[in-house]
C-alpha cells in the first residue's frame, strides 16, 4: 500500500472514529490520533473564507476536512420577515432550537449560550425529537417530559384512544391501551385448497384432509357471517343506547336520502339487545308527523304472532328521541350478510345470480307461503313486497322484511278507509297478489334485452316467449298472466293448489337435501370439542419440571413420551411425520382407553416403555385430578 507519510500525519485514524482508540498508536501507526476539539467556537462566514485561504497545502488537497464548520444561518428572523406577507401566522412560528443536550453545562442556566454553541457543532444531535406518525396511535406514546396541554384524541384514528388529561402527565410513564385493529380473515391460510393431484377421485381406502372437515366455502361463509355479527363501530356519532339496544352499526347498503317505498328518511342498523344479548336489525324512520298514543301500534301484536320461515320475525316497535328527533324504531330478527333481491340479481357492478325458471318457481313458492301466513292473521304485506325489501339470507332462501311499517305510517288513512268499507283489508291483500306478480315479472324481464323492457304487461309477456335468453315453459307464462290480471277476486289457496302443487315437491326435496348436508357436516365436527379437551389436559400436565414429583420415572414423564409419540415422530429418512389422520387415530384410541399396547421411546432413545392406551388415560385422569386439587 502506497502511503504518503506527510499527509497521513494530518489524517485522523479510522480506529479513532470507529472504536474511539487505536491499539497501534504507539506501535507505528502513521495516522493522527488527536481527537478534534469540539469545544471551539463556531467560525463566522468571513473568517471561514480566510481560514480556507490560509490553510496548509496538505489540508487544501484533502477532499473531506473534519474541521470544516457546519453551515448555520446567521439571522433566522430575517427569513421569517421575508415571508410574513404570505400568512399572518408566519411570524409566530418558533425558531427550532435543539434541547436536552448532555453534560452538566446544558442544565445550568448560566452556561446556556455555551451549550447552544456546543450543540451547533454536532452534525447529529441525539436530543433532537424524532418524527412520530400520528397513525400509530398509543402504541408509541409521547414523551412523558413534554410540557403543555395535551392534544385531543383524533376520533378517526383507531389506535388514538387516550384522553387529553393523561397526556399532560409529566412525572410518570403513562400506559395507553391500543385498540385491536380489524383485519380481514385469511381464509386461504386457514384451510388451503388441496394440490391438484389430490382433487382427482381417490380409491375408497384413501382420503384427504378436506374430507375430515367442513368444506372451505361453507366455512368461509359461516366465518363471514360471524364476523358481520360481531362487528362494532367505535367512536361513532350514533346513539349509545336506544331503549334496550346498543352498539349500533349501519348495515343499509342504500345511500338514498329518502326511502323510495315510504318517501321518508330511513336507515337500518345492527344492534345488540341488553336483555338476551342477541343481535337484531333496527329500522329507523324519521317521522313527519307526531305519534302521541299507541293507536298506530295496534297491529304490532298480530305481526309478532306471525311465525313463518319466509317472514322476518318482528320483535317490537316504538318511538324514540335518541337520534335527536322523533323517530319510529322497528326491530326485527337479524340475518348477517343478507342482501336484497335487487342487489342479488340487478345491482350493476357486482356479481349477480343468474335468473332461471327453477329459481323463479322457488321464489314463487316461498313468497306464496309467506303471504298465506300473513293473510291468515288478517294482515297485508303492503310495502314488504318490494325488490328492495325481500332479503336473501342463504342460497335461494328469501324472506319478507320491513313488515308492519306501512300499517304505522298509514294509520290515519287506514282508519278512515275501514270506517267507509269493511272490505278495505281484502283490497290490500289483493294488492299483495298484484305486487307478487310484478316482482316475478320484473325478475323474468332480466332475461330479455334492455330495449324491450317497458311497463306494458302484455308486451313483456309476449317478449318472454320470443326474446328471452332462456326458454320459459307455458305453465310459468300462464302463472305470470294470472298473477298480473286486474281482477277483484283472487283465491290464493286455490291458486296454490292449481299451479304450485307439483312445484312444492321440488322445493321440499331441495330443502331436505340441504338439511341432510348440514347434518352430515355437523356430524364431522361433533367430536372436535372432545379431542380439544383431551389436548388441553395433556398440555396442563406435561412440561412442569418444577413439580416435586417430576422425574423421568414418574407418571408425568410417560405422558410426555406419549406426546412425543404423537407429534414428534420421524420416518426412516429422518423427516418429521406430519400425518393428521395418525394424530386423530391415536387421540381417539386414548379417549376410548383401549387395551392396545405400544412402545414409547424417549428422544435420546435411552428410555423405553411398553404401555397401553388405557393405562395412559388413567394416568392422565389421575395426574389432572391431583393438579386441580393442589
Curated annotation (Swiss-Prot):
GO BP annotation list: mRNA processing; nuclear-transcribed mRNA poly(A) tail shortening; postreplication repair
UniProt GO molecular function: ATP binding; poly(A) binding; zinc ion binding
Alphabetical list of SUPFAM superfamilies matching this protein: Protein kinase-like (PK-like)
Pfam short name (any one): Pan3_PK
Start and end residues of each stretch annotated as Disordered: 38-72, 135-171
Subunit and interaction comment: Homodimer. Forms a heterotrimer with a catalytic subunit PAN2 to form the poly(A)-nuclease (PAN) deadenylation complex. Interacts (via PAM-2 motif) with poly(A)-binding protein PAB1 (via PABC domain), conferring substrate specificity of the enzyme complex.
The protein's name in its UniProt record: PAN2-PAN3 deadenylation complex subunit PAN3
Organism of provenance: Scheffersomyces stipitis (strain ATCC 58785 / CBS 6054 / NBRC 10063 / NRRL Y-11545) (Yeast)
Gene name tied to this protein: PAN3
Amino acid at each position: 500500500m502506497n502511503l504518503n507519510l506527510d499527509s497521513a500525519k494530518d489524517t485522523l485514524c479510522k480506529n479513532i472514529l470507529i472504536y474511539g482508540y487505536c491499539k497501534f498508536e504507539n506501535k507505528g501507526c502513521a495516522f493522527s490520533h488527536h481527537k478534534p476539539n469540539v469545544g471551539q467556537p463556531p467560525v463566522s462566514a468571513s473568517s471561514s473564507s480566510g481560514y480556507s485561504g490560509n490553510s496548509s497545502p496538505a489540508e487544501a488537497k484533502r477532499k473531506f476536512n473534519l474541521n470544516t464548520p457546519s453551515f448555520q444561518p446567521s439571522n433566522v428572523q430575517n427569513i421569517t420577515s421575508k415571508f410574513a406577507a404570505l400568512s399572518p401566522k408566519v411570524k409566530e412560528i418558533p425558531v427550532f432550537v435543539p434541547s436536552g443536550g448532555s453534560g452538566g453545562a446544558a442544565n445550568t442556566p448560566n452556561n446556556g449560550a455555551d451549550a447552544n454553541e456546543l450543540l451547533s457543532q454536532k452534525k447529529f444531535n441525539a436530543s433532537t425529537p424524532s418524527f412520530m406518525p400520528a397513525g400509530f396511535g398509543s402504541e408509541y406514546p409521547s414523551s412523558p417530559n413534554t410540557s403543555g396541554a395535551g392534544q385531543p384524541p383524533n376520533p378517526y384514528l383507531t389506535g388514538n384512544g387516550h384522553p387529553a388529561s393523561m397526556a399532560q402527565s409529566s412525572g410518570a410513564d403513562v400506559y395507553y391501551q391500543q385498540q385491536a385493529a380489524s383485519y380481514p380473515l385469511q381464509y386461504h391460510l386457514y384451510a388451503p385448497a388441496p394440490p391438484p393431484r389430490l382433487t382427482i377421485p381417490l380409491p375408497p381406502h384413501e382420503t384427504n384432509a378436506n374430507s375430515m372437515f367442513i368444506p372451505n366455502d361453507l366455512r368461509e361463509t359461516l366465518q363471514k357471517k360471524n364476523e358481520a355479527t360481531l362487528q362494532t363501530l367505535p367512536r361513532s356519532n350514533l346513539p349509545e343506547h336506544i331503549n334496550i339496544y346498543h352498539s349500533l352499526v349501519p348495515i343499509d347498503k342504500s345511500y338514498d336520502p329518502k326511502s323510495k317505498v315510504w318517501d321518508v328518511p330511513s336507515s337500518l342498523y345492527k344492534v345488540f339487545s341488553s336483555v338476551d344479548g342477541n343481535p337484531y336489525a333496527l329500522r329507523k324512520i324519521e317521522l313527519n308527523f307526531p305519534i302521541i298514543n299507541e293507536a298506530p301500534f295496534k297491529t304490532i301484536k298480530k305481526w309478532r304472532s306471525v311465525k313463518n320461515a319466509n317472514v322476518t320475525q318482528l320483535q317490537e316497535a316504538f318511538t324514540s328521541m335518541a337520534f335527536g328527533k322523533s323517530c319510529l324504531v322497528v326491530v326485527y330478527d337479524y340475518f348477517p350478510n343478507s342482501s336484497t333481491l335487487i342487489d342479488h340479481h340487478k345491482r350493476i357492478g357486482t356479481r349477480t345470480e343468474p335468473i332461471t325458471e327453477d329459481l323463479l318457481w322457488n321464489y314463487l313458492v316461498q313468497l306464496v307461503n309467506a303471504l298465506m301466513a300473513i293473510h291468515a292473521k288478517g294482515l297485508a304485506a303492503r310495502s314488504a313486497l318490494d325488490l328492495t325489501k325481500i332479503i336473501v339470507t342463504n342460497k335461494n332462501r328469501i324472506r319478507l322484511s320491513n313488515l308492519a311499517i306501512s300499517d304505522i305510517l298509514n294509520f290515519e288513512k287506514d282508519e278512515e278507509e275501514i270506517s267507509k268499507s269493511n272490505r278495505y283489508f281484502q283490497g290490500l291483500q289483493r294488492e299483495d297478489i298484484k305486487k307478487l306478480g310484478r316482482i316475478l315479472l320484473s325478475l323474468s324481464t332480466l332475461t330479455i334485452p334492455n330495449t324491450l323492457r317497458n311497463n306494458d304487461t302484455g308486451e313483456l309477456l309476449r317478449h318472454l316467449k320470443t326474446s328471452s335468453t332462456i326458454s320459459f315453459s307455458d305453465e310459468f307464462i300462464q302463472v305470470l298472466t294470472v298473477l298480473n290480471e286486474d281482477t277483484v277476486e283472487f283465491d290464493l289457496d286455490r291458486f296454490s293448489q292449481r299451479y304450485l302443487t307439483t312445484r312444492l315437491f321440488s322445493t321440499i326435496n331441495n330443502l331436505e337435501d340441504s338439511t341432510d348436508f348440514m347434518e352430515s357436516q355437523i356430524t364431522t365436527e361433533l367430536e372436535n370439542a372432545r379431542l380439544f379437551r383431551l389436548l388441553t389436559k395433556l398440555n396442563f400436565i406435561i412440561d412442569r419440571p418444577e413439580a416435586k414429583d417430576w422425574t423421568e420415572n414418574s407418571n408425568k414423564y410417560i405422558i410426555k413420551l406419549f406426546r412425543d409419540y404423537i407429534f414428534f415422530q420421524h420416518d426412516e429418512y429422518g423427516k418429521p411425520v406430519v400425518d393428521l389422520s395418525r394424530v386423530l387415530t391415536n387421540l381417539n384410541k386414548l379417549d376410548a382407553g383401549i387395551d392396545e399396547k405400544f412402545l414409547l421411546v424417549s428422544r435420546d432413545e435411552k428410555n423405553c416403555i411398553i404401555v397401553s392406551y388405557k393405562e395412559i388415560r388413567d394416568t392422565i385422569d389421575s395426574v389432572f385430578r391431583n393438579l386441580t386439587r393442589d
